[in-house]
Structures are given as C-alpha cells and as structure tokens.
Amino acid sequence: MTSLTQNRYFQKLQDWHRDNSADINLRSLFDADPERFNNFSLNLNTTHGHILVDYSKNLVNKEVMQMLVDLARSRGVETMRDNMFSGVKINYTEDRAVLHVALRNRSNSPIVVDSRDVMPEVNRVLEKMRSFCQRVRSGEWKGYSGKPITDIVNIGIGGSDLGPLMVTEALKPYASGGPRIWFVSNIDGTHIAKTLANLTPESSLFIVASKTFTTQETITNAETAKEWFLGASRDPSTVAKHFIALSTNTSKVKEFGIDPQNMFEFWDWVGGRYSLWSAIGLSIALHIGFDNFEQLLSGAHWMDQHFRKTPLEKNAPVLLALLGIWYINFYGCETHALLPYDQYMHRFAAYFQQGDMESNGKSITRSGTRVDHHTGPIVWGEPGTNGQHAFYQLIHQGTKMIPCDFLIPVQTQHPIRKGLHHKILLANFLAQTEALMKGKSNEEAKKELQAAGKSPEDLEKLLPHKVFEGNRPTNSIVFTKLTPFILGALIALYEHKIFVQGVIWDINSFDQWGVELGKQLAKNIEPELDGSAPVTSHDSSTNGLIKFIKQQRDIRIE
C-alpha cells in the first residue's frame, strides 16, 4: 500500500487544511446552515432504543467529510472490513484471524477460519456458560461446606480484567439476584489482600482468566487466593468447587488443581482487548444473568451489521474514525477525551484506553516500514460532571485542542427527586458542548463584566481571562437508556472506529508487541532483587534504583 502521506486524498485534505483551517468557525457554520444538525448527525434506530451520533460540532463541512470518506475508500477500509468478517487472517504479524465479531454473531451465519465454521464451537461454549450461570445463580452450585456462592472473584489482567470490570460496573442495575463481583488484576499484593479481606472462603468462587495460564500477575494472584482458600478448607480436593479457569492450556489448569470440566475455552482469533464477548465475559454473565449477557452480545451484533452493511457516508464507526483522523493527522491533536455523563460508565474511558492505545499505538506499517505520520491518540476521560470540576478548564481555555466525545442516556436508571438529578446532568451535558463550540467573544465577556458592575480598571484586567475562543470540536452520543443491548452497541461502535483508523494508518491493530519488552526485563531483574549484593548489570539509573530499594526495604518505619 502507498504511504498515507502519498495518498492523493490525504494530500487534498492537507491542501484544504492549509488553505482553510484558519477560517473555519463553528459558529459561522451553524449560522450559515440551519440544517447543519440534520446534515451532520445519525439517528441509529436499534431494536432496543435509539443512538444519536451528533457530529455537527466538528471543524468540518460537506467537502471535508467527502474527502475523508474518499480517503477511507482509497485505503481499503471496505475490503479490510469484509476480510475481518470473513475470517481472513488480517492479524498478519501473528498469522491470526480477528473474529471477536463471531462471538456475538447472533444470526449464526457461518464464519470460516482454515476451512472450518467456528460458530458451532462458539455456540457450545456459550451454552456451557449459560448452564454454569444458571447453576451458580440459582444456588444449585454449592461450595465445599454446602453453602451457595455469594461472591465471584475474577482474577485476570488487561483484556481479562478491563472489559468485564467496565461492563459489570455499567450494568449494575441488571445484577439483581446475582452474586457480588470482585476484580483482582494488579500484582501489587494490596489488590488481592484487600479483596480477600471482604470474602468468606466457603461461599467464594474464583475465576482465573489467562489464555496460556502462565500470565505472571494472574497466576501469582490465583496461587495466593488458593493458599488463602486452602487455609480454610484444608482439603485440596475442594479447589474444584471454588476455582474456574478461562484458558486454553488444559495441562496447566489441571496442574493448578482445577477440574478441566470447569475450564471454559476461547480461541487464538480472540484478542485480549476484544475478549469480553467470549468466556472471558463469564463474570459478566454470572453478575447480570446470562439473558442480559446475550442482550449485550445482541447489541454488539446490531452494530456489527450496521458497520458491515451501511455505506461509509452514513456509517457511525467510520465517521467517528474519520473525524479522529482529521484531528490527529491534520490538526496535530495528540489526545482524545471520552466523557460519559453516566456514573455507571465510569470505567468506559479506562477500558478504551487499552482498546485504542494498545491497538493503534504502533509505528510500523504492514510492509515493515516506519510511518511518516501520527497514529493512535492518548485516550482519557472521567464521568461528567466530575470532570467539569477537574480538567475541563484545559479543554476550554488551554493551548491544546482536545477533541471530545460526550455520551449520555436520555433516561436514567435512578429518576430520584422526580428526575431532578438527571435533568441537571442533561443540562450540563448540553451546556458543555455548546460552550466548547461557541465560546465567549470579547464583546460578550465585556458586556457580562459591565452588567456585573465591574469598574473600568477591573474590567480591563479581567477581560482577557473571561474570553473563551470556542471552536473546540465535540461529538455528542445520546442514547435512550443504558441497557445491556445499548452498551454492547456502544462498545462495538468504538471497536470498529479503532479498526478503521488502523486500516487508514496501515498498521496492525490486533497485536501488542509493545507490552513484551518490559515483561522480559522484569524476569531478569526479579532474581537480582534478592540479597544485598550490589547490581551492576544495568545502566547507572537502574542499578541505582535497585541499590536504593535494597537499602530501604528493611528499614522500620512507624
């Protein structure tokens, strides 16, 4: 594939940006086009409510959007999309298909990898998950003392933690009748210790999520949990009633003491950060019930079908991806804020930090050459309105442009005080995107200060600080209610956005070699931390840090 910067549509966009970007003004665009909202928004009518994607408050016009769509087409987005859904091994560095879409393929149409339809295997594991969830949630599955399970602990890291954690938090209102859920990921002993302190061994069930069953953090935490558990049960045979494996390594699972009957498998065509749809989502299904888990899958499948069948010009994941390309590759933006105005979605941005940054934090193209353009952004964010009292100052008046996605449900799960809280939340959501778009002109700020009775001297001093440039781009994503179906659709929306950007940048969004080097070095350093002998095998900084740690670790601090 030709370098992105040599692509003629990319160059047309560069020329347009050079000649026009200084003059594009959102206020003027809205004033000039009364239909701008209708022309630059999508109303997705799902079978479980609507998702409105309003992208009218972006620094684009119809000409720019058409050039961006032409760029996507010329970069092979449609072909790569079809290849992914068809089981082609588009993860070329690992020679793997990319088929998280198969896990939620509710239409059950065949998806073939290596001449074999994967859907029978997918359905078999889903049925096993359904049966297991029913047994645990009904109380039929008993612990070693005959008590039902009250607490589930998911032990995993990365994709085996972030997705299930985000979804179980987002869907708490649907967890009625389910066990409590806990997540342990960090190798820091504080995480497992503080979790175990809340639990009773005889009614706790541990899910150990590791494809290879060799992930250091996960297995170390699982062994600690087993040691704690056996301290109470004093019978190794009871491990089978309290530990479940999500893995493909049967021998390691048996070695740990888990009955292979209690092992739920998944496949190498499921990437970790796309795995919540697989057996890795068992903790989700146990918490909210399998029927609701299926609704999550159905919502994602709905978005898959929209992404696969809708022309690029009206395709929500594609349009969000192209707007990101516009800001990253032409405006030089380095970050993207995800700002959900729903407390249940408080882990949404953290989840897509991995989803986006591990996928598109790459600098080498499919042909093995270094890119000559920017790729994945830094993704961050917090729920509204908390963020308004923390970092919105920089978004409004800082020196960096930060494109933002604002997300909110029209209906709240908790309409307390006759909906007052949610009305205030909605008002703040709407006000922020309008304020970022419009800003406050010098004249408007001056009139405001005069109306407040400021003296000429105070007015002159305060005026520059009260001006807001505006022209800050945002997307507004408004949905009827945060249900399992809608959450599934929203997650898939962003997954496909990330995929489209990776195709345009000509990088592999489905490997993660960048996480390996640090892990390799940590294995070498770990034995060097034993004893008191000085270490000289590293650079002076690392040697000095090791020396300091050895000096300080036995000092008694009250």
Curated annotation (Swiss-Prot):
Phosphorylation at Ser-185 by CK2 has been shown to decrease enzymatic activity and may contribute to secretion by a non-classical secretory pathway. GO terms for biological process: canonical glycolysis; erythrocyte homeostasis; fructose 6-phosphate metabolic process; gluconeogenesis; glucose 6-phosphate metabolic process; glucose homeostasis; in utero embryonic development; mesoderm formation. The active site is at E358, H389, K519. It comes from Cricetulus griseus. It is found in: Cytoplasm; Secreted. The gene is GPI. This is Glucose-6-phosphate isomerase. The modification N6-acetyllysine is found at K12, K142, K454. Pathway: Carbohydrate degradation; glycolysis; D-glyceraldehyde 3-phosphate and glycerone phosphate from D-glucose: step 2/4.
